[in-house]
Amino acid sequence: MPAREIAFRLRERAMLAIERAWNGLRAAEPPPADAPSVALDSFAARFYISPQERQALPAFVQATFPEWIAKAVEEADALCDHRLQLLGYGTVDLGLEIDWHRDPVTGVEWPRRFWADYDLVNDGTYGDSKTIHELNRQQHLPRLGKAYFLTGEERYAVEAIDQIASWIAQNPEGVGINWHSSLEIAIRVLSWLWTIFFLLPSPAFTEQFARGVMQSVSAQLRHVCRYPSLYSSPNTHLIGEATALFVGGLLLDGTAETRKWRDLGARLLVREIGNQILDDGVHCELSTSYHCYAADFYMQALILAHRNGFDFAPEIAGKVEQMLEFVMHVTRPDGAIPQLGDDDGGRALALDRQDYHCYLDGLSSGAVLFGRADFKWQSRAFREETFWLLGRDACTVYAALPATCPETNRRDFPSAGYFVHRTGWTERDTHVVFDCGGLGAPTGGHGHADALSLVLFSGGRDLLI
């Protein structure tokens, strides 16, 4: 263990001891009277979509993409009944009153204790933490807020606000399973920031709620800032945490602390794209799912940085474009991505799709962001996530791009050990990926012992997996 890691772990242990002692006192104290509110104007001005265009968006979507509204309403109606799709379990019913500590699949309730006192690796008493974590990412809330934004139906806004308020009430700072993982906190913060954007016109978005949600967002980002996933096979965990710090710090900019979050997030994102993305643009863990996961986080940060004139290191854009080139080539003729390595079933941004069985929305956004006609060809259509990330003008840019078939039917990724061949770029063509790489990251990560295997897709179906 290097000296730097020893110092980091000793410092973390000291912080935990202080926080554990302070936690009981903190729970008894009232919230500070000067808790920050949402600076609605500045938040909206920095968001992905500008205040000038947001008012016209619902009518534009109704005229241009009415199917998006129909889908949003159908899902929002189910969410108002506390029914949602969760991982591979299908629809789960959260009950009349949502208990954010109860596993929605097994019904087992996780105990309330200091956040660092859970042993998720060795103690299986309460089951798999993945399901409770997935629920508490609250990635369904932006889709509920989106339905309100597109329809003006107030009950969707009220439901989203009620769920956030109930989460805050049930999860005091530092207590419970939902404070255990900095990555899960980071994804929840990103979900809340999108939800806030969609709900800003709602009468239910009161000053009292604004203060409460900002207290919680600040506490959660403060936690991520204190306890990033360093020296623990972090990889995509650290990328996700850095994205939340950067996005949250940039959107809420106004204090020394928010600028600290922004700058730390930016430094980590720049560092980790060099550490984790190989020379050929493939993520080091050699998992197609986690590759898309990392690309999705970087796209969120890169687009918001461009929107706000934040000067990222130039290698960020180049590496993200490389990552999308891998996605373009590895995507099969049916639009799906072969499942190489682990897949946890989650997603970094879930405004539309909830998994990475395909990542055509990333290619759609990449076509607009980088002016890539071949990305447009493979994305097949303008995707909803591109609209929310890049705004209405992205529709015009995408439409003006020619859809140009990629130049080659073969692409080698030698650093990763992937060799992709295809007979063409139509839906009936054959597509094969040879895996000649290693296990992935030095600690194994999400790679599999699958060297010299291959996946074959032909005639519209899997032949070898």
Whereabouts are the PLM-identified features?
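Short secondary-structure junctions and interdomain/linker hinges
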Residues: E5, A17, A21, L25-A28, ...
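Short, flexible loop/turn elements at secondary-structure junctions
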Residues: P104, Q139-P142, T423-W425, G438
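Boundary detector for helix-to-coil junctions that initiate low-complexity/charged tails
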Residues: M1-A14
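Extended, charge-enriched "interface" segments that sit outside catalytic cores
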Residues: A17-D123, K130-L135
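Generic detection of long, well-ordered alpha-helical segments
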Residues: R4, P51, P58, Q62, ...
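Acidic/polar residues at beta-strand termini and the immediately following turn/coil
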Residues: D103-V105, L278, D342
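Aromatic-lined, polymer-binding surfaces characteristic
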Residues: W110-N122, Y126-E321, E325-I337, D344
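Carbohydrate-active enzyme catalytic cores, enriched for enzymes
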Residues: V282, L286-I465
